[in-house]
């Protein structure tokens, strides 16, 4: 008895691929570099990190927890898109959109991080200012003081750009760090970038993590030579 082998048509193959792309993994739908949760998506906008997971609902009791693995140099750009007009403020503020966010970042570089900064931008290179409606919970006490499990000093800035700077701590290669904060906006469906500056505020000799040269000290010595 002969059995006829049925090969999938191109149309069938496309349907199968689309099906697997639509299958949720964990609590969010996942594609390469993009994770979608109800009402919001998180996606890669730079090639120097891996977006590993995103969970939660964005409330104070159940914050979004985004896990990343940074392996390259330069700024880390995470794109955030609130696509549901009914998303609302999930942190009990008067903003059109608001959510609590925890970022877990794994240091897979060869550098010691003595400094970490988070900044909001509408477009890459165009920082969020005081009047554009995008902020780290501007004029709100939600989740404040912002905090980290590895940095003890936090600078919460609103002017001229929305920036949170974390210092007085360190994250060695292979270690992870957690940041807790909030993001708000006055529009219903904003799309923006969370920019992460991972370069420490000093120069290093070779790759020795024990002998940093602070830039402030270098500038002071140069001024004395003038």
Predicted regions and their residues:
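An exposed acidic His-Trp-rich patch
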Residues: 116-151
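Buried hydrophobic-core signal for structured, non-transmembrane domains
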Residues: 103-105
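Short acidic/proline- and small/hydrophobic-mixed sequence motifs that coincide with surface turns
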Residues: 111-115
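Bacterial N-terminal signal peptides
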Residues: 12-24
């Amino acid at each position: 008895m002969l059995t006829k082998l049925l090969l999938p048509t191109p149309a069938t193959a496309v349907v199968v691929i689309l099906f697997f792309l639509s299958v949720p993994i964990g609590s969010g739908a996942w594609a390469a570099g993009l994770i979608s949760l109800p009402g919001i998506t998180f996606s890669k906008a730079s090639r120097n990190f891996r977006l590993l997971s995103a969970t939660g609902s964005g409330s104070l009791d159940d914050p979004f927890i985004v896990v990343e693995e940074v392996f390259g140099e330069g700024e880390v750009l995470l794109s955030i898109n609130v696509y549901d007009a009914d998303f609302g403020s999930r942190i009990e503020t008067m903003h059109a959109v608001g959510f609590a966010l925890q970022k877990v970042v794994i240091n897979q570089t060869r550098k010691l991080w003595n400094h970490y900064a988070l900044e909001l931008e509408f477009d890459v290179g165009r920082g969020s200012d005081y009047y554009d409606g995008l902020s780290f919970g501007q004029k709100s006490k939600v989740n404040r003081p912002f905090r980290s499990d590895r940095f003890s000093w936090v600078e919460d800035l609103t002017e001229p750009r929305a920036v949170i700077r974390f210092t007085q701590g360190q994250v060695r290669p292979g270690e992870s760090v957690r940041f807790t904060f909030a993001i708000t906006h006055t529009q219903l469906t904003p799309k923006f970038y969370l920019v992460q500056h991972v370069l420490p505020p000093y120069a290093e000799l070779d790759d020795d993590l024990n002998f940093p040269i602070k830039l402030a000290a270098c500038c002071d010595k140069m001024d004395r030579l003038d």
